[in-house]
Amino acid sequence: MIILKRNIVFLLIIIIVLGIFIATSIEIKNYKLSLNQNKNEISKNPPIWPAPFYGQFGNNSILISKEFNFTIISDSTLLLNKTLSKYYNLIFTQDNLINSSSNTLNKLNINLKSKNEILKFGFDESYKLIIKNNENSKLEGNTVYGIMRGLETFYQLIKYNFSDNSYFIENCLPLIINDKPRFPHRGVMLDTSRHFYSVDTILKVIESLSYNKFNTLHWHIIDSQSFPLSSKSYPNLINGAWSKSEIYSYHDIKRIIKYGKENGIRIQLEIDMPGHAKSWSVGYPDLLPHGWNDSTTTIKCPDYDVPLDPSSPLSLPISFGLLSEFSGTDYGYNPNYDDKSNNLFNLTVDDLFHVGGDEIEYQCWNNSKRIKDWMNENNLKTFQDVAKQFQLKIIKQLLKIGKIPVLWEDTFQLFYKDLPKDVIVEIYHDQSTAINATNNGYKIISSIARYWYLEYSYSNWIRAYNFEPTLNISKSNIHLVLGGEGAIWSESIDSSNLFQKLYPTSSAIAERLWSPIYYTNLLNAKSRLQSFRCSLLKRGINSAPLNNSSPLSAFSCYNS
């Protein structure tokens, strides 16, 4: 009996080992098959992230001479020169002892086709990079932003040999890359209300986004918990900030927008309304519903999520004033500020403006006699009618001042087919809402929480990489998917752990939004992402390891 049991155990072990071997063989076979089927899918060497639209690679290498320079062969701009200088300094941080010769790479010709530097939705980021030999190497872009994306690719191609103090490009020449993004809107949302981030931290976020070939920082600047936005139209609003030192001044905002342009990153502001408005009331108490915090009522209003009172005589003027002030326009809603000499109304902000519209707690309006009387006067039957009227006025105001309204999906669910078609809907609950919105002709931005919310403990790069934002959307509606965003909600995140939460998961989102849809091979992606993570660490971006929130033991970054 004992011998029989041992034989059974031995047989089970053999079956398990054989099963693992077969599964591994199938996985490797499928991996090779995937690479063979997708002829454009980039090899693990060179490990470019995000993968380009098209790449053709040889097997040769080349040394880079110490005389190497970027040679502009077209018209130049200050921003182009600044970008080239930035990447030169990022690349060449060590001694280079290689003299120039006919066998070394001595220059990269830069051809800028247009001096147009307007940074708005849909701007051109395409580029072409050719490296054959010293006499036939160039980077070409229709705009300086295409040159930026191409320089990031060039940066990732270059390696350094400490044994002979040389820079080189390895085993991929001759090289031709034709690259462009799959989606026009690719970003990360950063919540600066739950925790305040310094301007320098936000600038570092912008820089890291450019390395990932993102193009948008969605700045969720205010919320219920704090109001750190300094308004010269309504200066008492900053009384809702966490402290007097945790405020974004007008100068700070201009600095962030300027740095965004220098890195090819649009800054899309979000001023969430009418929900999440408790912090507004610290400076202007009449903005909230009377009786919202009445402890004697049976229907309680959550004190962290109190909405504006649309019946308040201040609600629309302050809301319109903020939209006008931070859109760079003035339509008479800024009574406390009429001195335009200091460029308050010259903010260069994005053409998309996010106004929230999510999670309106209707029970907070239920305890207010003023709201109910106002509803009767205006023939509004339900609190949904109240929300619709307010939101429609905000949407029309944004369109009046030349901005494209973006709202969370709650507003689409509130209006359904009656929502103006100018509105872009940001989807965060479920893909079924994305399908429903696009079937009804609405443009969408995808930010599905279970895949692309970065603060969750289960958030990881594989989960993010495997989500396809066009999943089950009809072919005729694919054009309505404008792109997507990873989201950082900051209840449990501050400057101490921000970048570990951002990366590498956001990098996976970056490739999903930039690269062709057929890039789905996880083995290939893991190899390239490990290399890219090392390049982030080298540049001071503190990305977490791929498989854990912190290192488990001693390893090279290429194996973490």
Swiss-Prot record:
One of its GO terms (cellular component) is membrane. It comes from the Eukaryota. Pfam families: Glyco_hydro_20, Glycohydro_20b2. It catalyses: Hydrolysis of terminal non-reducing N-acetyl-D-hexosamine residues in N-acetyl-beta-D-hexosaminides. Keywords: Glycoprotein, Glycosidase, Hydrolase, Lysosome, Signal. Its EC number is 3.2.1.52. Glycans are attached at N59, N69, N81, N99, N161, N293, N346, N366, N436, N472, N547. Residues 1-25 form the signal peptide. One of its GO terms (molecular function) is beta-N-acetylhexosaminidase activity. The active site is at E359. One of its GO terms (biological process) is N-glycan processing. Its main location: other. It is found in: Lysosome. Responsible for the degradation of GM2 gangliosides, and a variety of other molecules containing terminal N-acetyl hexosamines. Belongs to the glycosyl hydrolase 20 family. This is Beta-hexosaminidase subunit B1. The lineage of its organism: Eukaryota, Amoebozoa, Evosea, Eumycetozoa, Dictyostelia.
